[in-house]
Amino acid sequence: MKFTAILAATTILAGAAAAQDVDKSDWPSSFTVGTASQGGTYFAYGSGWANLVAKELGLTGGGEVTGGPMQNMALVHTGEAAFGMTTMGPAAESLAGTNPIAPGLEMTQACAMFPMYQTPFSVTALASSGIETVADIPAGAKIGFGPAGSTSDTYFPRMMDTLGVEYERRNGGWTDLGGQLQDGLLDVIAFAAGVPVPAVSQLEVQTDVNIIEFTEEEQAKLLEEFPVSQFDIASSTYTTLEADARSVSMWNFAIANCDLPESFVKAAVDVVMSDNERMKGIHKAAASSLPENWKKNTVLKWHPGAAAWFKENADADISDDMIYGN
């Protein structure tokens, strides 16, 4: 088993020695990671770390196309998927029993695993449409909100309502929606995905697009109404941007079924968290997949294996009541 680390030498040696002595008898021989639709950041990022963990731990594993964070919470809660990815908003709704996939079911068997990145909310239109601001979006515009049950589909329609936009709702995978935008079947796509969003990057290659930022007033309204934070999409993210674009964002976390073996989850976390350069090679959004961002989780209980890793390697002060089983 290989564990690449960028931590202190003593931590590396201790971790490597412990890894060799781990009892793997109760580990699964294979696993899946619930991601989202093809063409989105979740699929690229999730498939990447799934393959990495499988390779490093000598298991069979990979990413699975899903409807995104809401469905991932359900899949991981039931154990149909060992791992998944979610944003803090859908996670909170799922714990409260308001996940639309299974209303009334409190999905408490999905535990926090590691921090991923922030998901900015951004709007894209064809340059030929003349839509350059949210206020330019015409009444009755056909807006693609991503896969049903995704973070974008859950929150962006409510955000558009808050900003006074009248629209016709459309759902689909990001790649498919990008094609519909290019073909004139959609007026706007409302993206909530880690940047750069593959579908947006692909659109930039094929046509001229406008990546629309929120005004200060629009951003303030969203910050007041939703569980989001201020975020700027860096101008270097897309060739279209000439300056940073004002946005809002939610944090994403990898999740694990709470009953998975502690040593298995701890080893998987080590593979992902111990080499950020390798993770950035999977997707640029992984620049935020850093151990110190463990504190961005204020919603989900931690898997005991993940909590142990962050306590040992990131000096994480995770309270006992935030660790599953305590």
Protein language model annotation of sequence segments:
Residues 20-93:
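N-terminal (or domain-start) structured segment
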Residues 28-56, 60-61, 119-183, 292, ...:
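Bilobed "Venus flytrap"/periplasmic-binding protein-like clamshell domains
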Residues 139-155, 227-298:
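Ligand-binding clefts/hinges and TM-proximal coupling segments of bilobed small-molecule sensing domains
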Residues 1-19:
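Gram-negative bacterial Sec-dependent N-terminal signal peptides
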Residues 28, 58, 68-71, 78, ...:
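Extracytoplasmic
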Residues 88-90, 97-103, 129, 165-260:
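Pocket-lining segment of extracytoplasmic ligand-binding domains
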Residues 28-29, 176, 182-183, 193, ...:
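An extracytoplasmic/periplasmic, membrane-proximal ligand-sensing/linker region
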Residues 92-98, 109-115:
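Short beta-strand-centered segments that line the small-molecule binding cleft or hinge
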